[in-house]
């Protein structure tokens, strides 16, 4: 089954059981964690999803993004993995929300797709955490216009050291690798999020790559959150 078929099949399966109103209720005011890679966002995500009244899709949303070919990267030239409002046309928004809804689970592992009415007996807020979210705020804000963003920041020394460690492991094992065989790149693949300007890192050390990812992640988050009302985010 190709990616487009998967997207539409998941949407159809969800809508066979859930109404539009129920889908909107399940995705009401999601909490989206923003951070550089290796900033402790997994720990925060795991803490929040153990609280009553929360839901999640069981992990990071790479599997949802992966089903939408035009959301893999900014453009076909792979200039970055940054997404903006233009990537979120009305049909994409509907299908993306449906695909997220199809994976929703609460703390007791109750599935929204299997029994929407039971799932919605108690209000729940989706907790979403994926490193690439740092580059996708305009897109996410259009898909989830009532979202609340949490900006998690970690000091550069520890954060960059952790990114270097993860890259070392990723190049050896494939873990953390988001763009294997990236055209124009001088290593087996690229790990974590792909910011604009990544080609300038060809031939550079892992320390320089890690520092670049830390800087671009935090800089992009700060710049995009500054365009939103203050009540839309917290640090």
Map each language-model feature to its residues.
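PAPS-dependent sulfotransferase catalytic domain
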Residues: 69-71, 120-235
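PAPS-dependent sulfotransferase catalytic core
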Residues: 1-111, 170, 185
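Short N-terminal edge-element motif at the start of the domain
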Residues: 114-117
């Amino acid at each position: 089954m190709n990616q487009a078929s998967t997207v539409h099949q998941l949407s159809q399966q969800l809508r066979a059981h859930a109404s539009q109103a129920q889908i909107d209720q399940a995705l009401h005011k999601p909490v989206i964690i923003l951070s550089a890679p290796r900033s402790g966002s997994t720990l925060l995500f795991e803490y929040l999803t153990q609280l009553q009244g929360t839901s999640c899709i069981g992990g990071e949303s790479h599997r949802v993004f992966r089903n939408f070919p035009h959301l893999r990267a900014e453009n076909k030239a792979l200039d970055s993995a940054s997404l903006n409002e233009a990537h979120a046309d009305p049909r994409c928004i509907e299908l993306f929300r449906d695909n997220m809804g199809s994976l929703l689970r609460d703390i007791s592992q109750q599935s929204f797709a299997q029994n929407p009415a039971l799932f919605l007996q108690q209000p729940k807020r989706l907790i979403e955490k994926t490193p690439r979210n740092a580059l996708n705020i305009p897109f996410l804000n259009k898909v989830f216009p009532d979202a609340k963003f949490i900006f998690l920041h970690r000091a550069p020394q520890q954060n960059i050291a952790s990114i270097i460690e993860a890259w070392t492991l990723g190049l050896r094992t494939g873990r953390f690798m988001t763009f294997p065989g990236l055209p124009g790149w001088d290593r087996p693949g690229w790990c974590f999020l792909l910011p604009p300007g990544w080609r300038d890192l060809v031939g550079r050390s892992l320390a320089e790559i890690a520092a670049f990812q830390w800087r671009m992640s935090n800089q992009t988050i700060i710049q995009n959150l500054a365009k939103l009302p203050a009540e839309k985010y917290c640090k």
